[in-house]
Amino acid sequence: MEKVAARGIKIDLHIHSEYSKAKDGQKVAENTLNNVPILVQGLCDNQVEMCAITDHDTFDYDIYSELKKEESKDNCIQKVLPGIEFSVEFIEGKVIHIVTIFDDRDDEKVRNIQNIMINGKGKTCYKKTKEAYTKSDYFDILSEINIDFIMIAHQKKTPSSQHKPHANDVMSLGKEVFNELVFMDYFDAYEFRNKKNEIYNKIYSFEK
């Protein structure tokens, strides 16, 4: 049988720029358009071939397009995708972060993401008191963006962990909700802090 992928590649779909300062503070202050070459060097040092800048609840086309130029250069970067890390009040009082990655083939639609997030639903639907979108508004925004997407949920601990879940982690929704999401294949993927989480999730799913 022919393989879909001949080899594994390194990807990083969770990079923040200065446009995440509202939540990340000064630690991203130097992650500017002018410093994209420094980012590229770091990605190449780690042999990352696919990447995305996924700022908190916003999108900047200029910094995306500057990084995307690297696709045509003779370095490790083969693909740059547009994305946003959305803060979503998934259930009452529980906000989780969903890294949302978009198809890059329609550049006009990709360019329009910035307008939607800054001047459209991305601005008007944002609940400042919660620092998040409602689940309904999140999907309304995706509908307006009108680009194929994948959703990647934060999960930094294993389902069997006895420690308190991280804030904005999908496990913070509670075990019952987490079970439902896993078995419904609600999210396309989960973001793991380490490889063990992936293994434990597979075992957990099989056991259930």
Regions found by a protein language model. Give the residues of each.
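A basic- and aromatic-enriched beta-loop-alpha substructure that forms the phosphate/nucleotide-
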Residues: I91-K128
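Short, surface-exposed, polar/charged, turn-prone segments marking secondary-structure boundaries
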Residues: I38-V40, V80-L81, E108-N112, K127-T129, ...
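An N-terminally biased module of ancient metal coordination in phosphate/nucleic-acid-related enzymes
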Residues: M1-G93
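Short, flexible active-site-adjacent loop segments at beta-strand->alpha-helix junctions, enriched
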Residues: F86, F102-D104, K157
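Short low-complexity stretches enriched in small and charged residues
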Residues: V4-R7, A52-F59, D104-V110, D140-I145
